[in-house]
């Protein structure tokens, strides 16, 4: 891998994102589509931009992302985590600010499995006393 490129892997729920930071003008490409084209929701676009806005590097990098698995929210979170890791690979001094904002820690919440005899993970059939 060349020195002009920084890499970070991000995960959230079942989504995994591979993020490449290259010096550029601020283009964000996700699975060969633009950020606005890939995410319909403004909240998802905002989540992806958060680490860049915090570190004031929005116009400094072109970001290339491949993301698989999960849904819209999980993919946005995975991309944010990947961008955070790539930024720390680029400049370790950004770590404290990113950690304070809560972007460094991987969100470990996963879907709870469905149990036998229950309708969902915790939803039980109606109880009849008599």
UniProtKB/Swiss-Prot annotation:
HAMAP family (alphabetical): Ribosomal_uS9_B
The family this protein is said to belong to: Belongs to the universal ribosomal protein uS9 family.
Native species: Pseudomonas fluorescens (strain ATCC BAA-477 / NRRL B-23932 / Pf-5)
Database matches in SUPFAM superfamilies: Ribosomal protein S5 domain 2-like
Any one Gene Ontology cellular component term annotated for this protein: cytosolic small ribosomal subunit
Cross-referenced Pfam families: Ribosomal_S9
UniProt entry tagged with the keyword Zinc-finger: no
Protein name: Small ribosomal subunit protein uS9
Domain of life: Bacteria
């Amino acid at each position: 891998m060349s020195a002009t490129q920084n890499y970070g892997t991000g995960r959230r729920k079942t989504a995994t994102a591979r993020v490449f930071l290259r010096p550029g003008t601020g283009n964000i490409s996700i699975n060969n589509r633009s950020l606005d084209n890939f995410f319909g929701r403004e909240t998802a676009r905002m989540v992806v931009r958060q680490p860049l806005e915090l570190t004031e590097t929005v116009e400094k990098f072109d970001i290339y992302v491949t993301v698989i698995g999960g849904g819209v929210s999980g993919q946005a979170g995975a991309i944010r985590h990947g961008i955070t890791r790539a930024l720390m690979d680029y400049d370790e001094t950004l770590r404290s600010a990113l950690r304070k904002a809560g972007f460094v820690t991987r969100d470990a919440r996963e879907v709870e499995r469905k149990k036998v005899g229950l309708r969902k993970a915790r939803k039980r059939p109606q109880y009849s006393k008599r």
